[in-house]
C-alpha cells in the first residue's frame, strides 16, 4: 500500500467517524429539547449534593418544610439554590446545639451522619472537618460564628469538592 492510498484510507475513516458522531448527536437533539441535552452534559459528574443545591446532603422528610425546598430526589432534599441548602444545614446544627446540647465537632457530626452501614467513614468525616476548622474534634465547642467554615468543610467531605465562595456560605448561614 502506498503512502498516498494509506493517507486517503485514513482520511476516509476519519470522515466517516465524524459524520456518524454528528448523526448520533443530531438524533439525540431531535428527541430531547436543547436545554435538556445541555443539562445532561453539564450535570455529568456533578455530585448529587451540588446538583440538588443541598451541599450537605440533608435527607428529605415530608415534615421538614425547609425554606427554598422544592421536593426530593428520592432520598435527599432538593433546594432552589445552594444558599437555602446551606441555611437548612445551619438551622440543623443550631438545633443540635440548642435542643440536644451537642457542642463539639464529634458530637455534631455523630448526630449529622451517624456511624453505621450507610456511613462507615464517620471518623474520617470528623477528622476532616476539625482539621479544616483548626480545632480538636472533642475539646472545643463549635461557635455559631464558626458555622461557615464548618459547613464549607462538610460540603467538601460530602461532595468531594467545595465549589462555593465563602461569602455564599456565610450568606446561607446568615439566613438561618
What does each model-identified segment do?
Residues 1-7, 89, 97:
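Amphipathic secondary-structure elements and adjacent low-complexity, charged linkers
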